[in-house]
A protein has these predicted regions:
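Class I SAM-dependent methyltransferase Rossmann-like catalytic core
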Residues: 5-22
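Conserved alpha-helix/loop element of class I SAM-dependent methyltransferases that forms part
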Residues: 19-38
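Class I SAM-dependent methyltransferase SAM/SAH-binding core
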Residues: 43, 49-100
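A short acidic, Gly/Pro-enriched loop at the edge of an enzyme's catalytic core
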Residues: 99-110
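A short SAM/SAH-binding and catalytic strip from SAM-dependent methyltransferases
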Residues: 110-123
Length: 251
């Protein structure tokens, strides 16, 4: 199994593929003053196995959500969970790239994306996705964000290599303004969204993942890389988190 397939194998068994939390997803809805009784057309971009999609479907019973992910394996999990949770009629799974979305212009009331926009870059994402939103439509994205203006060298070097577009919230808000949005809210994901919701469940899967893949060198390298990221977060969590950005498309 190649590294890409191994990563899918490790992460498709997780409820989340990145930091987040149900309370934080609902907080974003509340801050945006979303009418829960309205029939909204929503896209959840980079949905993974569906943590946010499934919650949105429960909280917004009159709405329809198109759950977009590049990986059919993740969408298979989402579809099974949607059936189990009796919300399958509110969700359509779509396997495609987030930089080649098939939506018509001004088709969406809400465009949601938790922990995924980094795959194409924050600026490219918010600029390219804007046309899919109706005037006044809601954008909610979470993005890896510096919490301090000065960071330890080890942390800075790691993220410069992983995601050079990482920046302070003030810079991200300016990007939203530059590309035709009115920012309406922002908050930082708390520590439990990293540890309890993502890293601890991920660590709990390491042993089974290694056994399932014959304790191969490739599998061990993936586990080691994941553990290095966890260690880095725990050491420097005062300097970094995901920020949740809320904005409305200008007319």
């Amino acid at each position: 199994m190649d590294d890409y397939s191994l990563l899918i194998d490790l992460h498709k068994r997780g409820h989340r593929q990145g930091p987040g939390g149900d309370a934080e997803t609902e907080l974003a809805l509340n801050l945006a003053l979303v009418d829960r009784k309205a029939g909204l057309n929503i896209a959840d971009i980079g949905c993974g196995t569906g943590a946010s999609t499934l919650l949105l479907a429960r909280l917004l019973p009159a709405s329809h959500i198109t759950a977009v992910d590049f990986l059919p394996d993740f969408l298979d999990v989402l579809n099974r969970e949607a059936e189990r949770g009796a919300v399958a009629d509110r969700i359509s799974a779509l396997a495609c790239s987030m930089d080649n979305l098939p939506f018509a212009d001004e088709a969406l009331d809400v465009l949601w994306s938790e922990g995924a926009i980094y795959n194409i870059g924050f600026e490219k994402g918010v600029a390219g996705w804007r046309r899919f939103l109706k005037p006044g439509g809601l954008l909610v994205v979470s993005e890896i964000t510096w919490l301090t203006d000065v960071r330890p060298t080890e942390l800075q070097k790691h993220w410069d290599g992983e995601y050079p577009e990482i920046d302070l919230a003030s810079a991200k808000i300016r990007v939203l303004e530059k590309h035709g949005y009115t920012p309406t809210g922002f908050f930082v994901l708390p520590e439990h969204c990293w540890l309890d919701e993502y890293y601890r469940p991920l660590q709990a899967r390491f042993d089974d993942f290694l056994k399932r893949n014959g304790n191969s060198e490739e599998a061990r390298e993936i586990v080691a890389a994941e553990q290095r990221e966890i260690d880095l977060y725990e050491r420097y969590k005062a300097h970094i988190s995901y920020g949740v950005y809320l904005a409305r498309r200008l007319d």
